[in-house]
């Protein structure tokens, strides 16, 4: 099924003329415990979509060093491990780098923590920013749908402001 789907998807992408805007990813922050499963999945993704940009949010340099991902996207608190070592540095932030004065967009954070992102992007010559929480109006694991005007923390699982930007 996956090969048939990939073929049809690539045809659609080409018909729409958006090939240069499309990226694919294998997994979100694979852990070192999942290394061998990730390696198998990444190989399949490379076979199916290798002509596209393949990116993955991951913070273990080992995955990139061993050729499992072309474009790693480390969490902002791990950016120094990747700076100067990857061809095109991207980064992201999400619910867990809320300590150590790292930037993020949580509702309860001082505004400076939002604005320092520009300095970090400049300092490390970051070329892309992966934004996951655009419109995730669900509880963790998508078990329930939420009203973003009444509940801002994904059912108490994420810091308020992490799971969506659009209201």
Regions found by a protein language model. Give the residues of each.
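Predominantly late transmembrane helices and immediately cytosolic-facing juxtamembrane segments
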Residues: 136-167
């Amino acid at each position: 099924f996956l090969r048939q789907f990939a073929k049809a998807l690539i045809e659609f992408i080409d018909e729409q003329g958006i090939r240069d805007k499309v990226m694919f990813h294998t997994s979100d922050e694979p852990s070192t415990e999942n290394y061998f499963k990730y390696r198998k999945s990444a190989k399949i993704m490379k076979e199916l979509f290798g002509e596209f940009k393949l990116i993955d949010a991951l913070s273990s340099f080992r995955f990139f060093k061993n050729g499992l991902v072309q474009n790693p996207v480390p969490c902002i608190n791990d950016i120094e491990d990747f700076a100067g070592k990857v061809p095109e540095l991207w980064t992201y932030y999400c619910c867990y780098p809320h300590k150590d004065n790292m930037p993020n967009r949580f509702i309860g954070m001082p505004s400076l923590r939002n604005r320092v992102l520009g300095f970090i992007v400049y300092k490390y010559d970051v070329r892309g920013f992966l934004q996951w929480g655009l419109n995730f109006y669900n509880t963790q694991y998508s078990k329930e749908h939420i009203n973003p005007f009444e509940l801002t923390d994904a059912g108490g699982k994420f810091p308020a402001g992490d799971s969506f930007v659009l209201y």
